[in-house]
């Protein structure tokens, strides 16, 4: 399963995957970016992937913090997630809507 689909299952269906549409004003999107080489050990291969959560709108800081609390230290039988950056203010978009990002490392077994 694609890592973005897995994250959507954790965060919910209202999260956009891989793109940030112009509407609605209040939105959360998740992006995948360059990953590390697989780690091979005896009888096992672990994959590390990186994701970025980007929030936009009047409540974007609160939403980014809530998302960070949900994902940081999340673990199940297939993945473990750790937060790798603080919630970061990236400014306003071309429509003056506030945006924040937060990044995570996802370990897949």
Predicted feature residues:
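Small/polar-rich, solvent-exposed N-terminal microdomains that initiate assembly or binding
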Residues: 1-43, 62-69, 74
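Hydrophobic beta-strand residues in large extracellular and virion-surface proteins
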Residues: 7, 15, 30, 53, ...
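A generic structural signal for short, non-catalytic loop/turn and secondary-structure boundary residues
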Residues: 22-24, 46, 95-97
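Compositionally biased, intrinsically disordered low-complexity segments enriched in polar/Pro/Gly
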Residues: 40-41, 45, 83-86
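Oligomerization/assembly interface segments of phage tail-like spikes and tubes
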Residues: 45-59, 98-108
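Short C-terminal domain-edge/linker segments immediately following a structured domain
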Residues: 59-66, 82-86
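Acidic-leaning, charged glycine-interspersed low-complexity segments
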Residues: 73-109
């Amino acid at each position: 399963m694609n890592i973005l689909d897995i994250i959507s299952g954790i965060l919910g269906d209202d999260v956009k995957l891989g793109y940030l549409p112009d509407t609605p004003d209040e939105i959360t999107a998740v992006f995948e970016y360059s990953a590390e080489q697989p780690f091979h050990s005896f009888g096992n291969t672990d994959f590390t992937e990186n994701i970025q959560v980007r929030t936009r709108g009047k409540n974007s800081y609160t939403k980014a913090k809530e998302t960070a609390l949900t994902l940081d230290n999340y673990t199940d039988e297939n993945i473990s997630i750790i937060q790798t950056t603080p919630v970061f203010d990236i400014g306003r978009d071309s429509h003056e809507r506030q945006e924040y990002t937060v990044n995570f490392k996802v370990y897949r077994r």
